[in-house]
């Protein structure tokens, strides 16, 4: 029975393999007088034409189009061993350009009077070889960094391009808020986004101690409406993040009273 089962399984696997070979997931080529069948790794679904298959190799579709296997072999010849993580700075620029092109098109289409600014959240990737490439590739764009901790804020202050925004989210104690005032004093376009009225009270306290220049002040609000998908439960009136409508009005009154309303953004 075991032999019969294995035979049936092998026959089934063989049929499935032939089916795959005849599908669009494989490319057939003739080389050295015999047929070769090469898997295309689903490249049409994920590469966005940034990677291509040519001469039987996966290649980077940029400039002289180096093959990934050639890059790995060269790394091995230099004495490096796996695993290797390859980064392609030109892809960063492509993605940044796509984002700005989309928003610039929408701004023009709907005659929007404002400007589009963007920030990259450092919590996603703080690796120097990525952050430095991102900053370098977005010099001509108003593309800054978002910080959620003191260490990330120091990193943003050190590497954000001139006139690019810095956004501070997450928990902020007095020390971090003071650091935000220091960033404003250095000339950074920085916004402290408050999560609760207690943070706004601390900002007002630090403003009285340090004086101008002040950072911009943002308010995270708690919307009544909810979205869809896996984050649906984290939104709406029951969300633990942001100010309620009542707290929003109170925050505006506090800013107006302390003559800081002009920094509200």
Q: What residue ranges belong to the model's regions?
A:
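Polybasic, lysine-rich low-complexity intrinsically disordered segments
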Residues: 1-2, 16-19
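Ser/Thr/Pro/Gly-rich low-complexity, intrinsically disordered segments
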Residues: 3-4, 27-28
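Residue-level detector of intrinsically disordered terminal segments
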Residues: 5, 15, 36-37
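Intrinsic-disorder-associated, low-complexity terminal segments enriched in Asp/Asn/His/Tyr and depleted
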Residues: 12-14, 21-24
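N-terminal basic/disordered segments at the start of proteins
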Residues: 33-64
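Low-complexity, highly charged intrinsically disordered N-terminal segments
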Residues: 54-64, 69-126
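Active-site-proximal beta-alpha core segment in soluble small-molecule metabolic enzymes
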Residues: 116-265
